[in-house]
UniProtKB/Swiss-Prot annotation:
Pfam families for the chain: FdhD-NarQ
Name of the protein in its database record: Sulfur carrier protein FdhD
Source species taxonomy: Bacteria, Pseudomonadati, Myxococcota, Myxococcia, Myxococcales
Top-rank taxon: Bacteria
Keyword Flavoprotein among UniProt keywords: no
Keyword line: Cytoplasm, Molybdenum cofactor biosynthesis
Compartments where located: Cytoplasm
């Protein structure tokens, strides 16, 4: 099984330095950059997220795809930063333009959605959120089995795909891995959900995700740092990724969604040792 052993390089603009006190003295410390990114569709503002600069176009594409606003890259003509280099705020606004003969219509897609705050004390709201998502996400088919060795290889690739974290200790990471263990895309960000949007967007551009993607080239695994929450499983299900693995625990709502969406959910992955919270049969296991 092929794995990526080469460490990734940090993207430009992802690290800043500040003077801090350490052991009674002043030193320069590397920090992860956090800045707002406004996502527009055909010039109209849709959303703003706090992110680490880098792969902004992929972030925008992945976000729109996960929300069902675009069906694939065929809907998109251009993805560009607004403004001019040197202007205040340049690089923090991304405009996604419809392809010729197409019209991306967020209002039509989002109309009638139940935007219900979900919290640990709101089990009913959580259930409604899952039911609503499953109205537009079909459960993933069982498909080909995925060996636990692939999960272990994916987590190894994840560990080697965090150059900014190595310098700052302040970022999350995500990586998509194919069935052969080779990385499809990797990204870091201050927001775990942003990192996932970035790798999904990159896979969309590469033709590895989306309605026209060949099953043989589609990613088999999404590996993430930290915990696997509801949003992470949602994005994996939307992208058709059958296995999600994290170094930490999932949330209860993430487990519920994974079981409904046919996503295999693994947590506390240490080599080939892990907890499997949903659809373990895909890994050749019996249980949840």
């Amino acid at each position: 099984m092929e794995t990526s052993l080469k460490r990734a390089a940090a993207p430009a603009g992802a690290v800043a330095e500040r003077t801090v006190l350490r052991n009674g003295g002043a030193v320069r410390d590397a920090l992860a950059v956090e800045e707002p990114l406004e996502i527009r569709v055909d010039g109209e503002r849709l959303a703003t997220t706090m992110r680490t600069p880098g792969a902004d176009g992929d972030l925008a594409l992945g976000f729109l795809f996960a929300e069902g606003i675009i069906a694939g890259v065929e809907d998109v003509g251009t993805v560009i930063h607004c403004g001019r280099p040197g202007e205040e705020g340049y690089g923090n606004v991304m405009d996604v333009r419809s392809a010729a003969g197409m019209r991306i219509d967020p209002e039509r897609v989002l109309e009638g959605r139940r935007f219900i705050p979900v919290s640990a004390a709101c089990g009913v709201c959580g259930r409604l959120s899952i039911d609503h998502l499953m109205e537009r996400l079909r459960p993933l088919p069982a498909g080909e089995p995925v060996p636990t060795a692939l999960v272990a290889a994916g987590m190894e690739t994840l560990a080697r795909s965090q150059p900014v974290f190595e310098r700052t200790g302040g970022l999350h990471a995500a990586v998509l891995v194919g069935r052969d263990g080779a990385p499809v895309a990797s990204a870091e960000d201050v927001g775990r959900h942003n990192a996932v949007d970035k790798v999904v967007g990159a896979a969309l551009r590469a033709g590895r995700v989306g309605p026209r993607a060949a099953a043989a080239s589609a990613p088999a695994l999404l590996a993430v740092s930290g915990r696997a929450g509801f949003e992470i499983v949602q994005k994996a299900a939307a992208a058709g990724v059958p296995v999600v693995a994290s170094v930490s625990a999932p949330s209860s709502l993430a487990v519920d969604l994974a079981r409904a969406a046919g996503v295999t959910l693994c947590g506390f992955v240490r080599g080939e040792r892990m907890n499997v919270y949903a659809n373990g049969e895909r890994l050749g296991l019996t249980g949840p």
